[in-house]
Amino acid sequence: MALRFYNTLSQQVEEFTPASDNTVRMYTCGPTVYDFAHIGNFRTFTFVDLLRKVLRANGFQLNHVMNITDVDDKIIRNAVAQHQSLEQYTKIYTEAFLEDCKMLRLERPERIAPATEHIHDMVSAIERLGDSQHTYASDGSVYFKIASFPGYGKLSHNDFSGNLAGARVDVDEYEKADARDFALWKTPKEGEPFWDTTIGPGRPGWHIECSVMAIKYLGETLDIHAGGIDLVFPHHENEIAQSESLTGKLFSRFWLHAEFLMVEGQKMSKSLGNYYTLRDLVAKGYEPESIRYLLASVPYRKSLNFTLDGLKAARIAIERLRNFKRRLETEPFAEGLSAILAERTAQASQAFIGGLNEDLNTAEALASVFEYVRDLNSAMDSGEFRAGNTTAALEFLARFDSIFDVLKPTAKAGELSDAEIDAQIAARAAAKKSRDFALADQIRDQLLAQGIILEDTKSGVRWKRK
């Protein structure tokens, strides 16, 4: 079953294979560490994590580089305002970001590349761009001449040929209407940090950082470059201009971009009170796996409306899957094998990977999982399920969780573990056997008070969390 992605560059869904050998050379834009990352950021980072896992599920090896932008306009402004060095300021938020990634179960890329560790490489690249007549200097800064690169606009599919030659933009982020020659190297303002280099004192512009680190670690042509939709212009457009001017080769074969996230139907904003970091939501009692599930549940090219009700629904969905897994592991089924259910498991597995392979259609993949769970729960209730079907069903769930990674609960202070619940159920069974019904009822009530619901069935006791 072919793996296909929508390529922003071609505006088409294309079959994907690496350019050479079996290794995917992938670069993704990481955080700008000027503050705690918010859930809009983590929508993109969760998409990248799913992308990694789907690539691996298709048998590919990964060489994935993610940058850390630890010098840019916002960082410098905030560090200066707080009277901290650049290193002191960014260390706080870099460590916080990595902790949040771990909490959200995001795999660590093969290489994390902080921009400030590559200043010499950036200066060298700027000098080479100057040697090939792609730059000019003005007031101590160095700018890229967008008129020197005929392909400028091919990623965002805009025509910038009529832009005024020599007009400049100094900020890192700007709109298409303000497309101008952009800064590769910025002369420092009074009080700002800077590096003394062969092209003068200053610091790099945002866009040159990613070009240089991507080429250094992955080569002149990447297989995949991914990020948020907001980076298509100017950041990724400028990366292409710089990189292809440096190498004369296609910078990346595939460009993948995750759509925006809304919160309660509105743009996320601190002024609206709907601005959430991962830490905000966890402090409110929402489990990281519920947040991960909600972020992953909508296909990456569709806008996601993130709501607190959606988080509650995500928890219910996850508990349904956990309860199904628990039934498979604990209920005594009749011996034998149902050929019909074996075929149903094979169909579900094919539908699951088929959805993911069609441009990471997570909604279709999840639908196949829940239809399967419904069918097998019905088979268990009717007595059709056989012990010989258990292993394949558990393997299917494991395959699901190797991508979505939500089945293992995050430990909470004071919350009973599965093993503790099973021990209480065993104690209740022993009390009932010895006809101590008062103790059995007491154990049941204590479990209920802790959010555990017991259900007595013909095949034994089932339990689930509220």
From Swiss-Prot:
Keyword Cytoplasm: yes
Span of the annotated motif 'HIGH' region: 31-41
Main location: cytoplasm
Keywords recorded for this protein, A-Z: Aminoacyl-tRNA synthetase, ATP-binding, Cytoplasm, Ligase, Metal-binding, Nucleotide-binding, Protein biosynthesis, Zinc
Sequence positions that bind ATP: K270
GO cellular component, one term: cytosol
Cofactor: binding details: Binds 1 zinc ion per subunit.
Designated name of the protein: Cysteine--tRNA ligase
